Each structure stands twice: as structure tokens, then as C-alpha cells.
Swiss-Prot record:
HAMAP family: Aden_phosphoribosyltr. Its EC number is 2.4.2.7. The keyword Translocase does not apply. One of its GO terms (biological process) is adenine salvage. This is Adenine phosphoribosyltransferase. Belongs to the purine/pyrimidine phosphoribosyltransferase family. It is found in: Cytoplasm. Keywords: Cytoplasm, Glycosyltransferase, Purine salvage, Transferase. GO terms for molecular function: adenine binding; adenine phosphoribosyltransferase activity; AMP binding. It catalyses: AMP + diphosphate = 5-phospho-alpha-D-ribose 1-diphosphate + adenine. It comes from Chlorobium phaeobacteroides (strain DSM 266 / SMG 266 / 2430). Transmembrane segments: none annotated. GO terms for cellular component: cytoplasm.
């Protein structure tokens, strides 16, 4: 079975007209979770993307980013929702379909010039990933690449990210599905 075949699709969630891609069915399966981490590890060992640290976006980016950090021998830095980090933070507000949200990172999380692999579970509109990239840059980091389990190219996030000059890698796409 493939990574894609282990992802549950839920129609009309969280609202009518949305096809939700649920990775919990993928990561609860030990073979599926291993496929994710092994494929990402292999990609980053073989493809010469130079980075120093992995930054994971709350919450599922922690699951993937933490395991990948361990597999690659890299440090892990969390990007969190407001009020969850105990020391001084940098914040980044970003727009959602209906409203806005904010994410934070410790101001001392990265060394100046650190090359970062930004990790999250799914790329849809790209808003959260671009906000996280802005945060990384605010605290002195450089985004080397963004990695996702799932890319939804039809939603437009991939193009938004590429238009900003960032590189992305995803394990599977749900295009036109």
C-alpha cells in the first residue's frame, strides 16, 4: 500500500464542499508512519538540500518533524500557537479563509543564518507555511526547503510558495481528487 492510500478522505469537513485529507489513519499505522519518515529521510540524505535544523509547525508538523529530526540527526524547533512558548517570542499574524491567526517562535530558537527545513503535514493555501517562513526569517534563519506529506495543488498553496521563491517537497499530491 502507498502513503496516499493510507490517508482517509472525509467529504464536507470542516464545511460543505471541502474534501478533508486526514493523515491520522496514515500515522496510526506503523508501516505508514515508517513509510513517511523513511521516504523523507531518504529524500534529504540523497538530494543535497543543505539545512541545519528542522522547524515543525503545530501540531502535526511536530509529529513528522520530530521523527525526521531524530532520523537525520538534526535539532528540532517548534512553531506554536500564541501563549504556548515560555520565553521571548517573535509572532507572525496571517490570514485564514475566515479571519486570521498567529503563530510564534522563540526569538533565540535559531542561530543567525541557520538553514531551516520547514515541516508540516499538509499544504493547502500555503498561509501557515508562509507565515512560518516569515517567522524563521524574523529570527535570523533561512528557509532551505518546505516539506509536506500531502500537497493539494488545486488549492493554490504550492504556487503561492513557489512564487515567493521557496522550494517545496511533498510525498503525495491530491490533485483533482
Amino acid at each position: 500500500m502507498t502513503i496516499k492510500s493510507r490517508i482517509r478522505s472525509i467529504p464536507d469537513y470542516p464545511k460543505k464542499g471541502i474534501m478533508f485529507r486526514d493523515i491520522t489513519t496514515l500515522i496510526k499505522d506503523p508501516v505508514g508512519f515508517r513509510l513517511v519518515i523513511d521516504n523523507l529521510t531518504q529524500h534529504y540524505l540523497q538530494n543535497g538540500v543543505d539545512f541545519d535544523v528542522i522547524v515543525g509547525i503545530e501540531a502535526r508538523g511536530f509529529i513528522i518533524g520530530g521523527a525526521l529530526s531524530y532520523a537525520l540527526g538534526k535539532g528540532f524547533v517548534p512553531v506554536r500557537k500564541p501563549g504556548k512558548l515560555p520565553a521571548d517570542v517573535a509572532s507572525q499574524k496571517y490570514e485564514l479563509e475566515y479571519g486570521s491567526d498567529t503563530i510564534e517562535i522563540h526569538i533565540d530558537a535559531l542561530e543567525e543564518g541557520s538553514r531551516v527545513l520547514l515541516v508540516d503535514d499538509l499544504l493547502a493555501t500555503g498561509g501557515t507555511a508562509l507565515a512560518a517562513a516569515a517567522l524563521v526569517e524574523k529570527v535570523g534563519g533561512v528557509v532551505a526547503e518546505m516539506a509536506f506529506i500531502v500537497n493539494l495543488p488545486d488549492v493554490g498553496g504550492e504556487q503561492r510558495i513557489l512564487d515567493k521563491g521557496y522550494s517545496i517537497f511533498s510525498l503525495t499530491d491530491f490533485e483533482g481528487d
